[in-house]
From Swiss-Prot:
GO cellular component: mitochondrial inner membrane; respiratory chain complex III
Topology with respect to the bilayer: Multi-pass membrane protein
Gene: MT-CYB
MF (Gene Ontology): metal ion binding; ubiquinol-cytochrome-c reductase activity
Protein family (similarity comment): Belongs to the cytochrome b family.
GO biological process, one term: mitochondrial electron transport, ubiquinol to cytochrome c
Transmembrane segments: 34-54, 78-99, 114-134, 179-199, 227-247, 289-309, 321-341, 348-368
Domain of life according to the entry: Eukaryota
Record InterPro entries: Cyt_b/b6_C (IPR005798), Cyt_b/b6_C_sf (IPR036150), Cyt_b/b6_N (IPR005797), Cytb/b6-like_sf (IPR027387), Cytochrome_b (IPR030689), Cytochrome_b_C_euk/bac (IPR048260), Cytochrome_b_N_euk/bac (IPR048259), Di-haem_cyt_TM (IPR016174)
Protein name: Cytochrome b
Complexes and interactors: The cytochrome bc1 complex contains 11 subunits: 3 respiratory subunits (MT-CYB, CYC1 and UQCRFS1), 2 core proteins (UQCRC1 and UQCRC2) and 6 low-molecular weight proteins (UQCRH/QCR6, UQCRB/QCR7, UQCRQ/QCR8, UQCR10/QCR9, UQCR11/QCR10 and a cleavage product of UQCRFS1). This cytochrome bc1 complex then forms a dimer.
Length: 380
């Protein structure tokens, strides 16, 4: 009998075991589509980014004009740029939904997969930040100045660290050049980490909405989930293309249409929408180092979720108290996002402080308490 190449060829075998013959729970819902959507986002960003890099000049005198030239004179350059800028937004929408799914269904109990995922989130945030600096508009320049300056809050070595990162005494040409180098490099780091993420995931197999072992009821990934994923791709790419064609600047800052000027500070310096929740947490602490620590903690707290799991049930499907807390947390993050976009004045300061406090309280205290209480109520 002839060998089946798909199952025996050294390289095809890896693809087969990951995308074709992979045993998958039969009941995973659409919330499990976001992993593959993130893969598509990554591919889209690398392709569009590569095409943009071919026309971009990483120099303070030329960066802004090179981006303008791309949009005016390069064939479909405007489309490539709009897809790349809005693709970042979709990347973050997908990753936040993916993390939310993981929190709700207890997927974080696959500890290695979860920890690599948090590292992936941090890498993605770094990539988006350095990328936002490249067009060298006002928001780019001042965003870079404000955020890199946060490192100066680190005791003793802070100032030295910031000047080393800048390559001088302020954000200038060396900063732009190194940010371009990093922005080119990091997506490939993300690809590598993604492969590690998948390797760990395929050691244990996917979780499912019931949070129970599904070894007795597995189906092959292809054709069931390949077709389901393709539907997800079509829907997401349709939304991305619609946004890029009909409202390309909807999520951007108008300030970035003004070339960078170190002598003029914009009235409101705020990051892109996907960083606003963390920015609100940073601003709600009236101390530089405290704010920086809270900002770091807002993401790093995800590393603690596997350690804080007290429930005897994995998923929240049958845990109404935890569900209420989960959706309160979602609303809380949306409030933080809104507060982060507002100026620092009376009602917003206190709302931001309350929302920041609630964010950490829910994750660190209320989730474990509610789960322990549910164990009691359900006599587990």
């Amino acid at each position: 009998m002839a060998l089946n190449l798909r199952k025996n060829h050294q390289i095809l075998k890896i693809i087969n075991d990951a995308l074709i013959d992979l045993p998958t729970p039969s009941n995973i819902s659409t919330w499990w589509n976001f992993g593959s959507l993130l893969g598509i986002c990554l591919i889209t960003q690398i392709v569009t980014g590569l095409l943009l890099a071919m026309h971009y000049t990483a120099d303070t005198n030329l960066a802004f004009s090179s981006v303008a030239h791309m949009c005016r004179d390069v064939q479909f350059g405007w489309l490539i740029r709009n897809l790349h800028a809005n693709g970042a937004s979709f990347f973050f929408i997908c990753i936040y939904l993916h993390i939310g799914r993981g929190l709700y269904y207890g997927s974080y109990l696959n500890k290695e997969t979860w920890n690599i995922g948090v590292i992936l989130l941090l890498t993605l945030m770094a990539t988006a930040f350095v990328g936002y600096v490249l067009p060298w508009g006002q928001x780019s320049f001042w965003g870079a100045t404000v955020i890199t300056n946060l490192f100066s809050a680190i005791p003793y070595i802070g100032q030295t660290l910031v000047e080393w990162a800048w390559g001088g005494f302020s954000v200038d040409n060396p900063t732009l050049t190194r940010f371009f180098a990093l922005h080119f490099l990091l997506p490939f780091v993300i690809v590598g980490l993604t492969l590690v993420h998948l390797t760990f995931l395929h050691e244990t197999g996917s979780n499912n909405p019931l949070g129970i072992p599904s070894d007795c009821d597995k189906i092959p990934f292809h054709p069931y989930y390949t077709i389901k994923d393709i539907l997800g791709f079509v829907l997401m790419l349709s939304l991305l293309v619609s946004l890029a064609l009909f409202a390309p600047n909807l999520l951007g800052d108008p300030e970035n249409f003004t070339p960078a000027n170190p002598l003029v500070t914009p009235p409101h310096i705020k990051p892109e929408w996907y960083f606003l929740f963390a920015y609100a947490i940073l601003r709600s602490i009236p101390n530089k180092l405290g704010g920086v620590l809270a900002l770091a903690a807002s993401i790093l707290v995800l590393f603690l979720t596997p350690l804080l799991h007290t429930s005897k049930l994995r998923s929240m499907t049958f845990r109404p108290l935890s569900q209420i807390l989960f959706w309160t947390l979602v609303a809380n993050v949306l409030i933080l996002t809104w507060v982060g976009s507002q100026p620092v004045e009376h009602p917003f300061i206190i709302i931001g402080q309350l929302a920041s406090f609630t964010y950490f309280t829910i994750i660190l205290i209320l989730f474990p308490l509610a789960a322990a209480l549910e164990n009691k109520l359900l006599k587990l």
